Design a protein with these regions (language model features):
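Hydrophobic face of amphipathic alpha-helices that form TPR/SEL1-like repeat modules
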Residues: 5, 19-28, 57-65, 94-101, ...
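Short helix-capping/linker turns of helical repeat alpha-solenoids
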Residues: 12-15, 28-30, 48-52, 64-66, ...
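Short, intrinsically disordered, charge-balanced linker/junction segments flanking boundaries
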Residues: 1-3, 208-217
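N-terminal leader/linker segments that initiate helical-solenoid repeat arrays
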Residues: 1-5, 10-13, 17
Length: 217
């Protein structure tokens, strides 16, 4: 019913937000059958009207499609850049990964850091986690900075990112790149384990089994 209503409204207004919403519903099969090809067409329409969410979704579909031509991939990169410039955090994160890995563009760690930071400040936990990992590893273009890594990993963990929670737990347990804090480490590893993170479950199991840092349970 909602889907039919959106279609009717769109026919009257040709509104980019409605076009994006229809595309999203078709992509996820919400209120209608799942239809990726139709979703892509709606995202195309909304994209032409500069809807950043549609630009991001469309770029993502093109990148994930093995039959995409180099020309389509270049257009997808253009759309993703536009969406990132418009402040879409998922686009900023996706574009950051492209520059970090040098996928179809020249590798640019500084640009990746700038994009990840923009997305992270919008509470994108994956971007914050990516920043934490970059600062922890260091690179020719980015000096290793354990304090910055700890800051971003903590932020991502607080946002509920299980991968950051696991990484932070390990960091606090080892006490090399961050002050050792077994209590906090167990708290973060438990939070990750409760989200089904197998690495965290294994690390906790090992801790309790050996009973070195914690009393045997």
């Amino acid at each position: 019913q909602a889907f039919a209503g959106f279609l009717e409204l769109e026919q009257q207004s040709h509104d980019d937000k409605l076009q994006y919403r229809i595309g999203w519903m078709l992509l996820h099969g919400v209120g209608t059958g799942k239809d990726e090809a139709a979703a892509r067409e709606w995202f195309e329409q909304a994209s032409k009207l500069d809807n950043p969410h549609a630009q991001y979704q469309l770029a993502r579909m093109i990148f994930n499609d093995p039959s995409s031509t180099p020309e389509q991939t270049a257009q997808a990169l253009e759309r993703l850049t536009k969406a990132a410039e418009a402040g879409q955090d998922c686009a900023q994160y996706a574009l950051g990964k492209i520059y970090r890995d040098g996928q179809g563009v020249e590798k640019d760690i500084q640009k990746a850091v700038a994009l990840f930071t923009l997305a992270a400040t919008k509470e994108n936990s994956f971007a914050a986690f990516a920043l934490g990992k970059l600062y922890l590893a260091g690179d020719a273009a980015l000096p290793r900075d354990p304090a910055a890594a700890l800051k971003w990993l903590t932020y991502a963990a607080e946002l509920g990112n299980q991968f950051a929670q696991y990484r932070l737990g390990k960091l606090l347990l080892q006490g090399e790149d961050a002050p050792k804090d077994v209590k906090a480490a167990i708290r973060w590893l438990t939070a990750a384990a409760e989200q089904g993170n197998q690495y965290a479950q294994y690390a906790l199991g090992k801790l309790y089994l050996l009973g070195k840092e914690v009393p045997k349970d």
